Amino acid sequence: MIKEYSIGGMSCAACSASVERVVSKIPGAEAASVNLSTERLTVRSERDLRAEIFAAVEKAGFTISDIQSIKKQSAIDAERRKKDMRQRKINLIIALVFTIPLFYVSMGHMIGLPIPKFIEEPKAFAITQILLLIPVIYAGRGFYVRGLKAVFALHPNMDSLIALGTIASIGYSVYSTVLIFEGHHELMHEGLYFESAGVIITLVMLGKYLEQRAKAKTGDAVSALIGLTPDTARVIYKDGTEHIVNADELVVGERIRVFPGERIPVDGIITEGTSSIDESMLSGESIPVDKNVGDKVIGGSVNTSGSFIYVSDKVGDDTVLAGMIRMVEQAQGSKAPIARLADKISGIFVPVVAAIAIISAVIWLIAGESFGVAIKILVSVLVIACPCALGLATPTAIMVGMGRGASMGIFIKNGEALEHTCGVDTVILDKTGTITCGKPDVVDIKPNGIDKGLFISLFACAEAGSEHPLAAAVTSYAGKNGIEYRNPDSYTALAGRGGRAISNGKELLVGNDRLMKENGIAFDEKAFEALTMSGSTPLMLAEDGKYLGIIGVADAVKPDSEAAIESLRSHGIDTWLVTGDNERTAKNVADKVGIKNIKSSCLPEDKNGFISFLRSSGKHVAMVGDGINDAAALASADVGIAIGTGTDVAMASADIVLAHGELTGISNAIMLSKATLRIIKQNLFWAFAYNTLGIPIAAGLLHAFGGPLLSPMIAALAMSLSSVTVLANALRLKVVKLK
């Protein structure tokens, strides 16, 4: 059996690894997998191990709870994330409030800033810094708890580097403070490094806060999907009375009435009435689907016209929408986090540096140096190997890269997305709202022996009583072109065919070929076929049985789509058009923009499966879409790119949002990611270069040949220089050319 649990208290990969490790040791547990981003534990076992799993996880220092229904669990997760972010914000504010004066007190005299007289006294100078540092340490206590725990577990991480580096600075500073109280006042300006510890803790806390804020938004996609389900439903009891009930309480077999404009609560089959249903949340297509008795309706879709009664056949977590939610969750969860080079190296770097520091101190003691000199060497090695530059190497480049992207209308949600985008070699594009404008428009007009203006006026009059998107396209066209039309005296919708309007005593029939044939009206079949072949939807108009002409309504291609596809091709990137539309419509659009690879008639699960197929074939896939139906595909791709003019669900599921809806942003995002990754590698090189060159000197290499002994202050300066180099290099991303 496979069970899922919600885990709380995890902050890094080491935490998730700890949970996996303790659960895997439980007898009977065949496999345990933790997803850090969704905070879920999945366990495969032969029997129910709930009690043992709860005990093991709680003993490891984490919280665990059962997974509730999708809707309830979403609310629980949202509240927990909100509480965590609130605490992080409070801790960050505390750290900032005390770090700023700490830095001022310790460094102000070096640049001529005035400081209070009493602080000029050595003892007061040291004690003031200690008092200011204590709240900062308290605010950043999580680094020490997680970092030291990882060290003791023999799995050091970035928190371990932060903890050991700042402990070294604080430890030496406390030692110097003791000497100051013994009369060594010269250590006042060369033995105290409290501000280094405070600044490091605060900067890292700021970075973690921003990282967690971005991570918290990954749940927005699921929340938005859950929001599609109405809270209540109108149930018809056996005695014929209707009652409003909680949608969560619905069971299979209940009769439910849905009025125009309402969302359908659960899946089912229509038993009475007809309607047009907006299923864009499933198919992504903007044109409603006509439904009759016996047709299936999907929970979360919108009834655009007509009242109907249906019988529920899937409720709760068994509905199509619930399946889509699970797909998004699983897709988000299946993304392996980018291999964080700094974290990997720190597993070796930390113990090696600690060993070098201890060995160096012991060697100099054996060589006859004093304990004070040995301590100075020990601290110098740890301080010069402080992970500040190492910790800044990746996040600073990512932050600047994100800022550069934002200035271009490319909003990158997190650093992982930016790094993933670098390797994209295949781009999958949805049609509606992505390559096309996303709404029907009149693209062709063929009057039959009647003035074009009068034809459009009569057509708009006939459609003015309809709420159908195709009708709206006609009336919108008339309005944009200054063509006046009157509202009909009456209008009757004809499901699956069109509509009948009465105006000035004349009958206007507007709709498809089926309507014309039913009423014995001859129409231009060649024009009808030509429009159909071009991918347009043909609409015809007849007045009192006389055919007046035909128009074509289609979703127009965006002006920049062709240029965007050409830009991707020039960079050696394959493009695919994957859509829910039929093959003819898909090919017509693909030909217009220059896409050669087409996959049509795809449901959301088909898109998801196709992406999985490409990825298993070694492709690095980016998915570009704008609709709710694209949510799972956006999440399952290596990189999800949403059009800013699309739905909130698509944007929440995506890694990158093109705010202006311009497809040329795809190639810009890829080039930006490559430039950023290049800067990250350079930063890591310089960070380690400073450390590897500085450590031998800090260990006393120069002193062994009669040279000076490196003081912790110079070590701290070297550490600062490495940070400055990393920051300056990252800032180059603001001006680097994207080729």
Task: Give the label of every model feature segment.
Residues 28-45, 50-51, 55, 194, ...:
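Conserved cytosolic catalytic loops of P-type ATPases
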Residues 17, 253, 412, 424, ...:
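Conserved ATP-binding TGD loop and adjacent catalytic N/P-domain core of P-type ATPases
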Residues 1-126, 149, 241-242, 322, ...:
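Flexible metal-binding regulatory segments at protein termini and peripheral loops
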